[in-house]
C-alpha cells in the first residue's frame, strides 16, 4: 500500500498503491534465533503413534515406511505425509462430531519475527520443524518440550537475495538423520538424536544469488533439493545427493545454458530450440525448482515443478518468442539418474511470473469411464490442471479464479489461448491473476473421502508494464517490469482497492472441473491445508485464526485465536492413542513483506509459535497486550518534486521488496520506515550506503544509490510518512477501521507476561 505524495490530487489524499503480487523480499532485521541447546532427543519407539516410550532408534525412516504410511497413520513421515503429497490424514478421532472439544494442548514460541512456512515432520513421537533463517527444532510431539535446536548461522547479509522472505518450508527425515536446505544454499544432514552436523554440502554457486527455501525430499536414498533466485538472474536446477555421505549423484538443469557449450543432456538440447536470441543464458534464464515435488514409487518417477523466467518479461528474456522450456512446467524425471521422462508446460513463454512450482498432488481416479493415474496442480496462472502422470498427456484444465491472460486451455493441444489484452510490451495492462498467482506455495489437499481438491486461493490483480530501461544487474532483481506505476489517488479509490484484497478456500471437483463450495476470507495470504478422515479441512488464516471446516459442505465448525497470521499448512499425528493437529504460525512471506497491505488487527503478534491441539486440550494462550504506536512526527526535509520522484523510483526498484509497497511493512521482522526514530533518521546514509546494519540483513545499496539519491530516497520516505499521517487524521480511518486502522499504527511488543513456551524454554 503506497501513500504517494507525487501522484496525489492533493498532499492530504496521497496515493495508496497496492503493489499486490510483487514476489520479492528479503532484507531487513534478523530474528533472534532460539537457543542451540542441542540437548539429546529422547528416542521414540517405532509405534510412536500410539506409544511414546523411548527406545534406541531415532527417526528410523526409510522409503518403505513412507510408502506404507497408511499402516502407521499416527506418523507424519514426509513433507506431504505420503509421497503422493495428498496431505490427507486417515486419523478420525478428531472429526466434525468431536471438533467442538478440540483444544490447545501445548504451544512453543519461536522467538522469530519473520515468516514461518514449514510442514513439521513427526516420527515416533518427535516433531521436527524449521523456522526462518533455516533453523531446525526438535520437540517432544506430546508435550512440546524442546529436545534440541540447530542454527546454521546463515549470514544475515544473504537475506537480500531471498525474493520472498527468509523462510523455510520444512525438513526431511531418513534413517536417523534430519536434512534441511539453508537460505544460503547449503544442504545439511543432522543427527536426529541431538542435532549435531553429520555432513554439509554447498549446493549452489555462492557468487550467484541462489537461495533455498523448499523442503528436501528423500527418494531411494537420495536427497533431492532445488533452489530459488530466478528474480536475481540464476539458472534453475534440481540436484540429488547421497543421504549417506552427501556426494552428488546427479543434477538436472531446467533451462539451457550457454549455447556455445555442450548441452548437459538431450532434453536441454531440445529445450534450447524454444528460446530465441543469443544472450538469454547471460541472465540465467530462471526456471528454479523452489518448492513442490512429488514421487510415484510404482512408476519410479519424480515430478518437479519449475518456476518463472529470468527476467519475467519474455520480450526481453527471449526476443522473438518461443515457449522457453522448461519454464513454468511440470517435469518428470528418473529419481535415480535425473534422466528426463516427459514434461507438461502450463504457461508457454511465461510473461507474468506464472510459476508451476505450486503444490502437485498424485491420485488415481476414474475420468470419462477410465481409471487414470493423474497429477493435479493449481499453478499461479489460474487454471486447475489434471495431467496423466504416466505419459504427461493433458486431460483437462479450467479456471479456478478469474483469469484475464488467457481465454481458455485448448482441449486438443493442452495449450492456453492467450488474450491479446495480456500483452504489456507497449501498454500498461491490469491482469488477473498477478505474480502472486491464483494460488501460491501454500499447499492444497486432496481427500479420497470426498474426491475433492481443496485450494487456498488468491487471484489478486497486478499492473504490468515493460521496463524499457532494463539492464541486467547481478546484484539486484531483474524482471523487466516497470514498478513506477501510479496507483489509486483518492481515499475512495484506496478503499475500493483494499476491499479487493481477499482470499478464499475452494473445494474443487477435479473430474468435473468445477467449484463445489467456497469459504470467503476477509484477508489474503491465508495458510495451507490439511484434510482428515474426520470430514474436516483445517486452515490457518491471515487474521490470526486457526479454523476447521467440514470437508463435504465447507461449514465452519471450529476456530481458535492464535494472535499471529498463519501461512503454513497444518499436519496431524497420534501419540499414546490421542490424535493431534499441529501448525506453525508466523506472519510473513512475499505478501506480508511486500504488498504494503495493512495487517489484520487480530494478526497482532510479531513473534511466531508452534501449536498443537487435541480433544480435551486445556491450555490457553495468553491474551496479547499489544502496545500500539501511532505514526511519529517526521523530520523537516526539503526536496523538489523531481527529487521526490527520483526517491520514489529508487524505493520502488530497491526497497519495497523488503519494506513494503508504499513504505508500509505488515510483518514484524522488517522495519516500517515510517516509524523510524530520530536516531535512525540521523544515520540514514550510514545505513543505506554505508552498510551499518549489514549484520542485521540490511546491506549497503551504494552500488545503486549515490549520495544525492540517498537524500532523495530519505525525503521520499518522509513525505510518504507525512501523507500517511494526513490520511490517518481523516474520517476514513474511522469509517473503514478493518482496512485502514493498522495502516496508521504498528504493534511495538507483546507486553503480557512472557510465555513459558518462549524460544529456548519449555512449552506450555
What residues fall within each predicted segment?
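Detector for the c-type heme attachment site
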Residues: 81, 389, 658-665, 689-690, ...
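Short, conserved, GDST-rich strand-edge loop motifs in beta-rich repeat architectures
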Residues: 225-237, 277, 304-324, 428, ...
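Repeat-blade elements of multi-bladed beta-propeller folds
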Residues: 76-80, 115-135, 160-186, 211-232, ...
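Extracytoplasmic beta-rich repeat domains
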Residues: 108-119, 149-172, 200-215, 253-292, ...
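Flexible coil segments in periplasmic/lumen-exposed cytochrome c-class electron-transfer proteins
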Residues: 625-645, 649-654, 661, 696-764
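Gly/Gly-Pro-rich "capping" loops immediately C-terminal to redox-active cysteine motifs
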Residues: 660-693, 699-700
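Bacterial signal peptide processing site
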Residues: 27-30
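Blade/loop signatures of beta-propeller domains
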Residues: 48-104, 258-269, 416-419, 494-495, ...
